[in-house]
Structure formats: C-alpha cells, structure tokens
C-alpha cells in the first residue's frame, strides 16, 4: 500500500475531526476520553477486534479513562489509506462506547 502524500493526508484529516498529524513522525494521532476505565477498556476491546479483522493495528496507551492512539503503516513507512479507514472505524466505535 502506498503512503499518502502530504496533501492527501491533509484532505483525510479534514474528514477526521480530532485527529492530528504528528510532528515527530509520519503518523496521525488522537486522544479519546470516556466516562471511566470500563468504557475506555470496552472501546479498546472493540477496536482490537476490528483491527485484527483488518490486520492493521494501532499504537495506543490507556490511562484510566483516556485512550491515546497513533496510526501509521509500518510496512509503507507512513500514513496510508489503511490508517484512514481504521481511524474512521475507531471514531464510530468511540461514539457507540460513549466517548466525550
């Protein structure tokens, strides 16, 4: 899969509210806030299932009710359409899980 150009990444980010291009590497990132740890963990569980099905996995960390996510396609050396698709799926899952 080919890396997205800078203009393609910017266009994709316009359709992904809350997602930002990371300065330190070619990746996109976002933080999600939930009511509590259980909601955050439920979100991560649902994303894990979707990510496994897509064979594309996020870099993430969880502290209590916050989940920080970074997406990049390591094989391509940057952001690809796979990252954009997973970001959209994560946003939909987050909404269903009560993200604030």
UniProtKB/Swiss-Prot annotation:
GO terms for molecular function: 4-alpha-hydroxytetrahydrobiopterin dehydratase activity. This is Putative pterin-4-alpha-carbinolamine dehydratase. Its EC number is 4.2.1.96. Pfam families: Pterin_4a (PF01329). It catalyses: (4aS,6R)-4a-hydroxy-L-erythro-5,6,7,8-tetrahydrobiopterin = (6R)-L-erythro-6,7-dihydrobiopterin + H2O. It comes from Rhodopseudomonas palustris (strain ATCC BAA-98 / CGA009). PANTHER family: PTERIN-4-ALPHA-CARBINOLAMINE DEHYDRATASE. InterPro entries: PCD_sf, Pterin_deHydtase. Belongs to the pterin-4-alpha-carbinolamine dehydratase family. Keywords: Lyase. GO terms for biological process: tetrahydrobiopterin biosynthetic process.
């Amino acid at each position: 899969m080919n890396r997205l150009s800078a203009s393609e990444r910017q266009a994709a980010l316009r359709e992904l509210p809350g997602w930002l291009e990371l300065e330190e590497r070619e990746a996109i990132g976002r933080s999600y806030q939930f009511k509590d740890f259980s909601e955050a963990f439920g979100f991560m569980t649902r994303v894990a299932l979707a990510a496994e099905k897509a064979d594309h996995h996020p870099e993430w960390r969880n502290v209590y009710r916050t989940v920080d996510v970074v997406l990049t396609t390591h094989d391509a050396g940057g952001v690809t359409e796979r990252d954009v698709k997973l970001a959209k799926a994560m946003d939909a899952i987050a909404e269903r899980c009560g993200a604030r």
